[in-house]
From Swiss-Prot:
Assembly notes: Interacts with the COP9 signalosome.
Organism expressing this protein natively: Arabidopsis thaliana
Domain notes: The F/D-rich region (45-62) is necessary but not sufficient for SMAP1 function.
Tagged with keyword Nucleus: no
Protein's recorded name: Small acidic protein 1
Tissue expression per record: Expressed in roots, flowers, siliques, stems, leaves and seeds. In flowers, detected in petals, anthers and pistils.
One example of a Gene Ontology biological process annotation: auxin-activated signaling pathway
Keywords: Auxin signaling pathway
Protein task: Mediates responses to the synthetic auxin 2,4-dichlorophenoxyacetic acid (2,4-D). Not involved in the response to indole-3-acetic acid (IAA). Interacts with RUB modification-related components and may regulate the cullin-ring ubiquitin E3 ligase complex (CRL) activity.
Presence of the UniProt keyword RNA-binding in the record: no
Phylogenetic placement of the source organism: Eukaryota, Viridiplantae, Streptophyta, Embryophyta, Tracheophyta
Phenotype upon loss of function: No visible phenotype, except a longer hypocotyl in light-grown seedlings.
Length: 62
């Protein structure tokens, strides 16, 4: 016998009610939104890959 759809939804609601909340996630998002850490972290290879010329035909895009 297959479980009814209502039974499966009620089980999902019960499982989420007991989970703990992480407070640190909010603080990390606030720091990233302010731009304090985003501008400081630059990939080491970013300049290397930007040195290559674009050889794609962009006429069909515009």
């Amino acid at each position: 016998m297959r479980p009814m759809q209502l039974d499966m939804l009620s089980e999902m609601d019960d499982a989420g009610s007991s989970m703990a909340m992480d407070v640190d996630d909010l603080e990390a998002m606030e720091i990233l939104n302010e731009g304090g850490l985003v501008s400081d972290n630059k990939l080491a290879d970013a300049d290397f890959f930007n040195k290559f010329d674009d050889d794609f035909d962009d006429t069909d895009i515009n």
